[in-house]
């Protein structure tokens, strides 16, 4: 099972990724983790990436694809792998295709923007303990106060409505076109093209998991 997981921020990709990983016995490959590991290990690509990052630059797609290819050589990838948060852009998808990285499925978890905004902007946190609440789905006993200490809850900057909307704009501009990219490739009849599946990310977690497993048959 070689898979790319797509979906907007707040769609529940992380939760579903854990279930998919467990079911198929495959590692979740995050480019952020890969970069940190390569830098720490001091691999040639890691050294190159560190130079760019230390200078405040963005690591090139070429370096990222090199890291991906190295990572896929590791033993835990023999039964497959799952990409989460990569590729993010069409040039990255092209680079992966050119590098011959095999993909069986592209699974999109679809959630309307209005639902994402409600999910994320409703989050509240008690910073000292890390306890989290949601104004609609998991409200504190007293509005705006932590259940245990009675201290104030805060809305993290990441969860503010305008921030969430900006992140969604970036997703729609850069990452959502990947669905069309992979669908067109699949429609071309190329045997190497992945199967593209879309499921709804609305409902209970176990319902979404059942949809995901069903789509990956």
From Swiss-Prot:
Residues 30-59 are annotated as: NMP. GO terms for cellular component: cytoplasm. The keyword Nucleotide-binding applies. It is an enzyme of class 2 (transferase). One of its GO terms (biological process) is AMP salvage. Its EC number is 2.7.4.3. PROSITE patterns: ADENYLATE_KINASE (PS00113). ATP binds at residues 10-15, 123, 132-133, 203. It is found in: Cytoplasm. Keywords: ATP-binding, Cytoplasm, Kinase, Nucleotide biosynthesis, Nucleotide-binding, Transferase. Consists of three domains, a large central CORE domain and two small peripheral domains, NMPbind and LID, which undergo movements during catalysis. The LID domain closes over the site of phosphoryl transfer upon ATP binding. Assembling and dissambling the active center during each catalytic cycle provides an effective means to prevent ATP hydrolysis. HAMAP family: Adenylate_kinase_Adk. Monomer. Catalyzes the reversible transfer of the terminal phosphate group between ATP and AMP. Plays an important role in cellular energy homeostasis and in adenine nucleotide metabolism. Belongs to the adenylate kinase family. This is Adenylate kinase. The lineage of its organism: Bacteria, Pseudomonadati, Pseudomonadota, Betaproteobacteria, Rhodocyclales. The gene is adk.
